[in-house]
């Protein structure tokens, strides 16, 4: 260690301006330390004689010896990082309070080096290291500031330390140093602020400390690292609803700057800017503002990127933006449909597929014009190809999209002609209740008020026992929601007034018995329910008077009673067709 050794060599160099004599034990420590430093790979400086020699110099009254100890600690810790004891940290923390700036620079560096190790991070904070580090951040010396902030940055990567740091008073000086004209100080400060954004409590502390205006202003920095730290910090801050409200009121230029950063030459800045917009777009006002700020052209380019992180960030962002009905047509007009359909084949990421399907689902519920383009994009055929083989999460989104599309009388015929029943019927057998429920609802919606029953009859018995099999399974499920879907579907089939359908249902004993079983199971509850209402009488033969206009009991009915009555009500309407 050239610098340290030079500080130790020579009698004259050991004298300081005070003219204090060097004690014998200090002279011996210098001699020993010179030997240790010349052969440092052979010694452990964190215990035994090397540590005692360093400690002796730290507690010397001789300024040069103190400097030598600080410089030695800085070099040793840079090369050798391992868990250390209190005996190592105590002299370094002592040096942090030294009035000499060179000593504070070196001791901050040493502490920052040791703070790479997780055990050391905890011990430094436990031993009260934050207070002297905060004082060093307030120094007028840029090097002291830089090393102190660098140490805080390392300490803040340990979760257990973050609350301590947030409550120590460190956030205000960190925020101030984020405006430093020195780029190294600025990088360290913004990096430390970023490390403090990984929990809701700490994010609130940051907002309260006034960090948001600083972070937003630094989005315009020419330094890619500073841009990245600030963009990521703001993205994390935007996770919380209360913070989004704060940003909406106090950061009016935020969206414009983030949209601009989607064109950054730095891939990670571009990605984080998109993620920040995604988080902001959890709120309705931001969904509109991002579009007004010109975000769609950039997003449609990014979802076609070769970078998986960029594709994921951008498709997640457009998914949130597509939630707002006023954005649906603009998204379609911006050319999103073809690349979104292409993303359905993105086998490398289930999450990307999910966001793509979810976005398409939102767009499917828009205007007739957009719905026409939706069908022309080939998305239905792609859904059919994926539906039975894709991951559960993707299948769930596809089933939800089919359920929404099937609600529209204008799209039912197209869906039936594209043979969606071929995949919807097997999906009703899924062990996932959301998938089976959505798929069954889609089948029921397709059947409701349909004039051409050709496809209904074609898929009555196949695949997987067809529509008939789905109805039998749901009638015997003992799950009220499934029973309701099956009963409602049967009622819709009867209301088509098709003799072939009548015959298929009436002659199938499993279907008939399933309906009667549900009627029997819910008769007692329904009768009590109606007696409480006093307006309607029901007999067990299925005759009812003014069922839809029944009175309600003054006491609140339970959800279970409501469900039982509704099930019984539908069974009675079906039984009228069966008799």
Swiss-Prot record:
The UniProt record lists the keyword Lipoprotein: yes
Lipid anchor positions (S-palmitoyl cysteine): 4-5, 7
GO molecular function annotations of the record: protein-membrane adaptor activity
One Pfam family here: HEAT_EZ
InterPro entries: ARM-like, ARM-type_fold, Armadillo, Vac8
Gene Ontology cellular component annotations, sorted alphabetically: fungal-type vacuole membrane
Keywords, comma-separated and alphabetical: Lipoprotein, Membrane, Myristate, Palmitate, Repeat, Vacuole
Region annotation (Disordered) ranges: 534-560
Function: Functions in both vacuole inheritance and protein targeting from the cytoplasm to vacuole.
Family: Belongs to the beta-catenin family.
Name of the protein: Vacuolar protein 8
Species, as recorded: Kluyveromyces lactis (strain ATCC 8585 / CBS 2359 / DSM 70799 / NBRC 1267 / NRRL Y-1140 / WM37) (Yeast)
Taxonomic lineage of the native organism: Eukaryota, Fungi, Dikarya, Ascomycota, Saccharomycotina
């Amino acid at each position: 260690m050239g610098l340290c050794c030079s500080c130790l060599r020579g009698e004259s160099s050991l004298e300081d301006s005070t003219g204090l004599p060097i004690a014998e034990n200090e002279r011996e420590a210098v001699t020993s330390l010179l030997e240790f430093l010349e052969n440092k790979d052979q010694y452990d400086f964190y215990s035994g004689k090397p540590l005692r020699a360093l400690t002796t110099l730290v507690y010397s009254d001789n300024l040069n010896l103190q400097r030598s100890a600080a410089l030695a600690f800085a070099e040793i810790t840079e090369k050798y990082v391992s868990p250390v004891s209190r005996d190592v940290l105590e002299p370094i923390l002592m040096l942090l309070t030294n009035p000499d700036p060179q000593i504070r620079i070196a001791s901050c560096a040493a502490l920052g080096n040791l703070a790479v190790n997780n055990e050391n991070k905890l011990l430094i904070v436990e031993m009260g290291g934050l207070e002297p580090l905060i004082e060093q951040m307030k120094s007028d010396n840029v090097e002291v500031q830089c090393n102190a902030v660098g140490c805080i940055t390392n300490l803040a990567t340990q979760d257990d330390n973050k609350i301590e740091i947030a409550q120590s008073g460190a956030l205000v000086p960190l925020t101030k140093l984020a405006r430093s004209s020195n780029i190294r100080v600025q990088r360290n400060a913004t990096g430390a602020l970023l490390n403090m954004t990984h929990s809701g409590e700490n994010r609130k502390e940051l907002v309260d400390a006034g960090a948001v205006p600083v972070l937003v202003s630094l989005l315009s920095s020419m330094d890619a690292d500073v841009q990245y730290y600030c963009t990521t910090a703001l993205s994390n801050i935007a996770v919380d609803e209360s913070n989004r409200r704060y940003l909406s009121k106090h950061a009016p230029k935020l969206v414009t700057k983030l949209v601009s950063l989607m064109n950054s030459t730095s891939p990670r800045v571009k990605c984080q800017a998109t993620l920040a917009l995604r988080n902001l777009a959890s709120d309705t006002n931001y969904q509109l503002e991002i579009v007004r700020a010109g975000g769609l052209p950039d997003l449609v380019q990014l979802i076609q990127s070769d970078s998986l992180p960029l594709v994921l960030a951008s498709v997640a962002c457009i998914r949130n933006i597509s939630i707002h009905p006023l954005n649906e047509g603009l998204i379609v007009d911006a050319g999103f449909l073809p690349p979104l359909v292409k993303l359905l084949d993105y086998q490398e990421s289930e999450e990307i597929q999910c966001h793509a399907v979810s976005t398409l689902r939102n767009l499917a519920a828009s205007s007739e014009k957009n719905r026409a383009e939706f069908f022309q994009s080939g998305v239905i055929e792609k859904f059919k190809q994926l539906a039975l083989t894709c991951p559960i999460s993707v299948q769930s989104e596809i089933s939800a999209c089919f359920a929404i599309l099937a609600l529209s009388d204008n799209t039912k015929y197209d869906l039936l002609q594209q043979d969606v029943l071929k995949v919807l019927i097997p999906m009703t057998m899924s062990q996932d209740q959301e998938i089976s429920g959505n798929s069954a609802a889609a089948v029921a919606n397709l059947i409701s008020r349909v004039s051409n029953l050709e496809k209904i009859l074609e898929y009555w018995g196949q695949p997987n026992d067809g529509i008939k099999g789905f109805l039998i399974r749901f009638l015997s499920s003992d799950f009220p929601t499934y029973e309701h879907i099956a009963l409602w579907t049967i009622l819709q089939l009867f209301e088509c007034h098709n003799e072939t359908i009548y015959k298929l249902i009436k002659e199938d004993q499993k279907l008939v018995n399933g309906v009667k079983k549900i009627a029997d199971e819910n008769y007692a509850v329904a009768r009590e329910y109606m007696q409480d209402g006093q307006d309607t009488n029901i007999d067990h033969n299925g005759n009812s008077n003014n069922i839809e206009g029944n009175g309600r009991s003054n006491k609140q009915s339970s959800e279970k009673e409501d469900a039982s009555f509704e099930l019984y009500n539908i069974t009675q309407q079906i039984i009228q067709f069966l008799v």
